[in-house]
From Swiss-Prot:
Pathway the protein acts in: One-carbon metabolism; tetrahydrofolate interconversion
Protein name: Bifunctional protein FolD
Organism this protein belongs to: Burkholderia vietnamiensis (strain G4 / LMG 22486)
CC annotations in GO: cytosol
HAMAP family cross-referenced by the UniProt entry: THF_DHG_CYH
Record key words, sorted: Amino-acid biosynthesis, Histidine biosynthesis, Hydrolase, Methionine biosynthesis, Multifunctional enzyme, NADP, One-carbon metabolism, Oxidoreductase, Purine biosynthesis
Amino acid sequence: MTALLIDGNALSKTLRAQAAERAAALTARGHQPGLAVILVGANPASEVYVRNKIKACEDNGFFSLKDAYPDTLSEADLLARIDELNRDPKIHGILVQLPLPAHIDSHKVIEAIAPEKDVDGFHVANAGALMTGKPLFRPCTPYGVMKMFEAHDIPLQGANAVVIGRSNIVGKPMAMLLLEAGATVTICHSKTRDLAAHTRQADIVVAAVGKRNILTADMVKPGATVIDVGMNRDDAGKLCGDVDFAGVKDVAGHITPVPGGVGPMTITMLLINTIEAAERAATA
């Protein structure tokens, strides 16, 4: 048995076309959706992510603004810039690219973003709203994974789901969204005693720890859906995920590749969240 591939590029293309239509409709009414992206320092990976986000905006009819600062930028100056963007009616979404330099408190920075412009969904108000089942914004990566389940008619109600990873960006919100969809959810992490005992019972496994080959074929229930959120490099320097793809694809029912799986969906859902923010602002 070879797993069906969940193609993030193809789904992303469809959803981006829908986002572009919504952006065009808003622009025609004088409310072009706008996203501001702030980059502090010269982290090469962050620079690539920011470039991809700005390009996605340009390709789909969004207004975008990129603020790039040296890593000597003070926390006070960054907070002042966020305050300006909070008050700018052309900007509907504000994204601060993480990680930030050590002298800047990322929690303080995220909390400074107006919740209605927090398109990453990381603000404590949005995290709390997600917990109570009424999210204003769903964090982009878990939201993208949910769209993948939906597109492939993968049943979530009553399913046993294991999320490997407990980060605020992926693991925790992923678990909340699965819970909201009616799955029975287990969160595993670095302190979990017997990871395989949990994953072998799972209909759905989401791997999001940033550790190569944390999930191997012998740990997967036949026919399970395996979502790989990891982003690592193998010994040859080639991009790979958290899952041993070559082995697991012969056991799983559905699987996402790396690259070309969850990655493209993250930026797509950022566009969708920005559109939703712009639509709310237009009707306010």
